[in-house]
Amino acid sequence: MSYAISPAEQSSVAIEGSEDRFPVRRIYCVGRNYRAHAIEMGADPDRDPPFFFMKPADAIVENGATIPYPSQTSNLHHEIELVVAIDKGGKDISLEDALNHV
């Protein structure tokens, strides 16, 4: 296949204790899931439920790398995310069986 421009490299993250990397295709996020931070940002966790959104896979910044942001930024809020790698799909997975899919 021929592309008009070169496609981006596959986004990936390091795997602790391995030389392999894990490919990242999608990043699903949960907002307002940390109560203290939600309050700090002016939300009421008892009234405002968590919400879901996505980020592009190339939004990943590796450990120790520089976070790119506009030079005129005066109030930068960064977040550290927990990554769960789903190994196999499923539907209506029981709580007891959930970790068998990670």
Predicted regions: what is each one?
Residues 1-102:
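Catalytic-core "active-site belt" of small-molecule-metabolizing enzymes
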